[in-house]
Design a protein with these regions (language model features):
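Conserved, well-structured core segments that form or line functional sites
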Residues: 125-126
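Alpha-helical segment proximal to the catalytic Tyr-Lys
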Residues: 129
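Extended, subdomain-level signal for the structured scaffold at the beginning of enzyme domains
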Residues: 1-121, 133-222
Length: 222
């Protein structure tokens, strides 16, 4: 089985509302699913190097295991840049969430190209929470949007309002996923919700991260 490519945000500021970054649990819980199954992972971020982290909770044993794992500690501290990646080495690309993604994922053409290439080569595209912001502008070789006509999921407008950041983020993800042609659905705030449409796997919130990993793993085993 080929590797899974994790993508983490490099953006560390939440407007004027303090720091942000990738959400630790949205990395650690899918990581645990893949690691326990013997799947190797690599990590990239738009700028490379050590990305900023949010949701830093080492009382979560999965977070703690990931944070201290000697191999993956090196990989998360020294993330590669998109240009360093050979797409054919990967069977899936996974976009972890965290509010930072809303600033540096949507318009990153290198990430769009990686996503398109992996998907059109038969690979899986996964994302959770704000991670699907990476997908709103991805176009396939035929010019159509990757998510057009597909069932998708991501952080809801209601959840953004609950955390009082609807006026801080550059756009509302739910609205943008719909505008890109996605068939968006959601559950009540903070409930696990995952949509699987062929080789596209998206989850609504941090609570959905493990289930997204499990859904990707199921597809990898087919």
């Amino acid at each position: 089985m080929k590797k899974v490519l994790f993508v983490l945000t490099s953006h560390g500021e939440k407007g004027n509302r303090g720091s942000t970054g990738y959400h630790l649990g949205e990395v650690s819980h899918p990581w645990k699913v893949f690691h326990d199954a013997g799947v190797e992972m690599d990590f990239i971020s738009p700028k490379g190097g050590e990305p900023p982290v949010d949701g830093f909770d080492l009382e979560d044993p999965t977070n703690l295991e990931f944070w201290n794992h000697p191999v993956y500690k090196e990989k998360r501290i020294h993330t590669k840049k998109p240009k360093d990646i050979i797409p054919s080495d990967y069977s899936a690309i996974y976009f972890a969430g965290g509010h930072g993604t809303m600033w540096d994922f949507p318009d990153n053409t290198e990430l769009q190209e990686l996503t398109k290439t992996i998907y059109e080569s038969g690979g899986i595209v996964g994302a959770v929470c704000h991670g699907p912001s990476a997908l709103v502008n991805v176009k396939l070789s035929n010019g159509s949007k990757l998510i057009a006509g597909k069932r998708v999921n991501g952080f809801s407008n209601e959840e953004e309002a609950i955390v009082k950041l609807e006026g801080v983020v550059p756009f509302l993800l739910e609205n943008q996923l719909i505008a890109a042609g996605g068939k968006y659905s959601k559950s009540a705030p903070w409930n696990t919700h995952v949509e699987v449409d062929e080789r596209l796997v998206t989850g609504q919130n941090p609570q959905s991260a493990r289930a997204v990993g499990e859904s990707i793993l199921s597809l990898l085993k087919k």
